[in-house]
């Protein structure tokens, strides 16, 4: 209704709604999750990313798993110094979004607080 049939406006509205839902969950405890790794095909670049959420159920979803792999690949390519720097960076696959925004989008979609807690690149 708010988009009046305009798919671009609808997409922006959905993303804003997801970001708002994610912000409401930021104080929730995150004890589940995984460590994701990425090794470039040449074996000379790699990274580790610890991504956490509230439950094992969400940690096992395709959305969460894909997010972890994408962030690990980003860390290997861009080599941020720390999590704070990572979250502010433009996402390699879509420079119109930051890493923080893609994390919040998945958080809004899953209904759980999702956080990157540590990173390493080599």
Model-derived segments and their meaning:
Residues 1-122:
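N-terminal assembly/interaction segments in proteins that build large macromolecular machines
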